Amino acid sequence: MIVPIVLFLTLCPSELSAWGSPGDPIVCGVRTETNKSIQIEWKEGRSEKLCQIDRLGHVTSWLRNHSSFQGLIGQVKGRPSVSYFPEGASYPRWSGLLSPCDAEWLGLIAVSKAGDTDMIVPGPTYKGKIFVERPTYNGYKGWGCADGKSLSHSGTYCETDSSVSSGLIQGDRVLWVGEVVCQRGTPVPEDVFSELVSLSQSEFPDVCKIDGVALNQCEQESIPQPLDVAWIDVGRSHKVLMREHKTKWVQESSAKDFVCFKVGQGPCSKQEEDDCMSKGNCHGDEVFCRMAGCSARMQDNQEGCRCELLQKPGEIIVNYGGVSVRPTCYGFSRMMATLEVHKPDRELTGCTGCHLECIEGGVKIVTLTSELRSATVCASHFCASAKGGSKTTDILFHTGALVGPNSIRITGQLLDGSKFSFDGHCIFPDGCMALDCTFCKEFLRNPQCYPVKKWLFLVVVIMCCYCALMLLTNILRAIGVWGTWVFAPIKLALALGLRLAKLSKKGLVAVVTRGQMIVNDELHQVRVERGEQNEGRQGYGPRGPIRHWLYSPALILILTTSICSGCDELVHAESKSITCKSASGNEKECSVTGRALLPAVNPGQEACLHFSVPGSPDSKCLKIKVKSINLRCKQASSYYVPEAKARCTSVRRCRWAGDCQSGCPTYFSSNSFSDDWANRMDRAGLGMSGCSDGCGGAACGCFNAAPSCIFWRKWVENPSNRVWKVSPCASWVLAATIELTLPSGEVKTLEPVTGQATQMFKGVAITYLGSSIEIVGMTRLCEMKEMGTGIMALAPCNDPGHAIMGNVGEIQCSSIESAKHIRSDGCIWNADLVGIELRVDDAVCFSKLTSVEAVANFSKIPATISGVRFDQGNHGESRIYGSPLDITRVSGEFSVSFRGMRLKLSEISASCTGEITNVSGCYSCMTGASVSIKLHSSKNTTGHLKCDSDETAFSVMEGTHTYRPHMSFDKAVIDEECVLNCGGHSSKLLLKGSLVFMDVPRFVDGSYVQTYHSKVPAGGRVPNPVDWLNALFGDGITRWILGIIGVLLACVMLFVVVVAITRRLIKGLTQRAKVA
């Protein structure tokens, strides 16, 4: 706790011992002795300290107006002995400027005792300091300790310090926090002050309070933390904070720019000073004599008044947001600020008051607590997305895509910002129950689902075809009659031409034949032999044309009959990879080492690796269930991008003032800093400096007509401290999200990326061997992640090391910390991002920066780019995954590496009995068929079902249960004998049922199918003709023939009946007409 004290300043008579010689620095001399009996009024809480007032504007006037003051002017060691924070503050270099202490002596500001709510800023080393002062947002505060004590290192309390003596305080025991210069400012009206405050609020939107005083209204704010900020004091209730501003120094021909004194005596009287200024009745330096005029006779009078220009830049004018003010004080210091805390997106939770309802073709999400913002629902390998806005939202999948029981996974976000994720379960119509239309496209594709309607439909179709054929025949006959009249002349001309051609050909053939006869007479014997050979060849010639039509049905059957891979793949592990030994409890302990390849399956399906060893009735399975197959970004080197803002500042100095002695100094380079900026900006920040000529002369507020110097600097800063991690994508590769189930029952979710093995889990590592895929428009996409909130986006970006304007990555930093502060040693940029325009008094800048936040908001995940929907996952390093909206076929398989995976097999056989109760689903499709098996087992084991079309394995529990393994078939009517092996016990089961044909899924708004493997069937546009005939008439050619004959006979009989009824009706109507 800081102990408040009341001390009295020890003073001595105001005798000025020496003023130095003309041209020397003016330093107020002091007496070495002190007069403790003389006291002045002192403010409560101030410690005993001395302030130097040398070479100050109005110093002579101040002394003259305070002639009754009996005190010590000046500090023994001079101002440089006072400590400053930050070190190396620039204003001590300008001895003509007022420090806060000086300004208080002149009555410009008032330093008050720090209260309990005032906070001392962290950063400086306070140990050994007796008095500390810093500007606060609404004043100037001082902290002090009593005699014999000094502040602790952190400044939070006073501690005993034997090296601190009472009486006069040495300068190195006084600490000024901040860089402050003061002057007599010009008051500003209330409306101007309100405009300045409004500008300040817009530049500091995230700052809630400064030193406990509200700047912006915030819903939630952080704890106080230090903030280094530039400010001006215009004499109002509080200071005005600034970021981007400009300063200029003006010189005015007034008494406050000169000091008049008598060498060795002290200040001139008021009358003497007025005479110097108005009549020139004194001597002085060159500037004073040029401005006021010095009489020649006074130049040699060394005892008269001498006036000299105060060696200071002049009076400071600050331009902030286009408003120019002459402040009372201008500074850069550390204050305590609270920042707005943005409510982060709530963690993924179960949605309270949310539930799922199953509707036709999709689901309905009901959110009771808040409206839905967005949601993604996945079932099997189909997904659908929706943007809500209400508490009840319908989300539809592909038409007819979902059949049977389906697990539903829902992830989304509510309007109140909370995220949720929960699972549901829906049972959709399966098999023929999913078809509820008559004489529609699905009816034509699945006649097996309409045992009565299909025959009626066939009869109607045949009758319609017959009628159409009769109509077509009549039309052709009519056309033939009409054509006889129209084409008769043309036919006559063609006949005459043909006759002439035949006669010409006959004459030509006769001539050729005569020539051949003459030659053959001479070679009669050769001709005879040749004739015999020809007769022999004719005996072996073809007896008639080949009947191609007999072979066509066979070829069609061969081409249209397809055998598809199973939806749930089963692979038997090689026994040589398994090493077993006997263990207690009738078990074998086995270790698996080696490698196996599992064929790829589609999302929602499982691939199994079956383990069995000779002599053991038991077997186990390792299962890989594919949850999704997506595109993932294969990241190149990452970098960090700040949410940067362009800044610039400038200071104009007249010629001869400060650094502008002979124009822009040669040493001022792109990395130089003006003294006016000494601690107002981070010297380690990324920026560029320069110096240019400005206006000069009286019109520009300068004594010298030569061009003044405009020192300018442009830089970038990150006021919000928001940083994005940008990861350019070298390529987009396939990755799978899988659920690995070990034979022991342990389950783990993995995300293998193409060509990269996962970490070893219980002796198992998975490598996904996916094919490459190319999508136009994705080559320059980069993953972007906001490091604070975790928001992710996809957008084009620059390659590492190439800061090209117009893309994300114009500024690239090597670390988060470098990006927060945009350090020059850790960031690169293009200096053209911030343009600079020089004006008469200052320089203004314009920004060409690309807003990273705006780009991220535009392409925020979830998003659809180049026909690919991108979502944000919950696992893995690469958190963005893409799903092509169009049906995408890829190839791939899983490589499973084993390094000592443990496996336990029972040596006791199980007794299994059961039957197949139902088969439903689709054939030659992506989802496959579901086989219902009711089994009773004497123990937990593994069941292996092998049919002619497919085989599968599933876990069997002790007792009676119903299991629904998935299998794949390539025909509509199933009638197969299967073998069930359950824990060493084998039995035969009969599998009968009908499956439906599933079309390639049709899209609805917001719905898409996840990427699937090309080796697994995915449906088609039309059924296989053989499957369709089997579904219509039954399995086998005999049934086809009988069915076709039956349909034709039915059509004939129906035709006869219809004709008979028609004739009878016509005859009846005719007889009635005659009677009438």
From Swiss-Prot:
Residues 477-523 are annotated as: Golgi retention signal. Residues 654-660, 695-709 are annotated as: Fusion loop. Disulfide bonds join 28-51, 145-158, 182-329, 208-218, 260-307, 289-294, 351-354, 358-426, 378-383, 567-608, 580-590, 633-729, 648-845, 654-702, 660-709, 664-691, 695-700, 782-797, 813-827, 912-982, 922-925. The chain crosses the membrane at residues 456-476, 1041-1061. Glycans are attached at residues 857, 918, 940. InterPro entries: Phlebo_G2_C, Phlebovirus_G1, Phlebovirus_G2_fusion. Residues 1-18 form the signal peptide. Residues 544-566 are annotated as: Internal signal sequence for glycoprotein C. Residues 477-539, 1062-1076 are cytoplasmic. The keyword Cell inner membrane does not apply. One of its GO terms (biological process) is symbiont entry into host cell. It holds the Pfam family Phlebovirus_G2. The record marks 1074 as: Important for glycoprotein C and glycoprotein N subcellular location. Keywords: Disulfide bond, Fusion of virus membrane with host endosomal membrane, Fusion of virus membrane with host membrane, Glycoprotein, Host endoplasmic reticulum, Host Golgi apparatus, Host membrane, Host-virus interaction, Lipoprotein, Membrane, Palmitate, Signal, Transmembrane, Transmembrane helix, Viral attachment to host cell, Viral penetration into host cytoplasm, Virion, Virus entry into host cell. Changing residue 462 to V: In strain: Isolate Human/United States/2/2009. The record marks 103-104, 566-567 as: Cleavage. It comes from the Viruses. Residues 19-455, 567-1040 are lumenal. Changing residue 737 to I: In strain: Isolate Human/United States/2/2009. Belongs to the phlebovirus envelope glycoprotein family. The sequence shown is that of isolate Human/United States/1/2009. This is Envelopment polyprotein. It comes from Heartland virus.
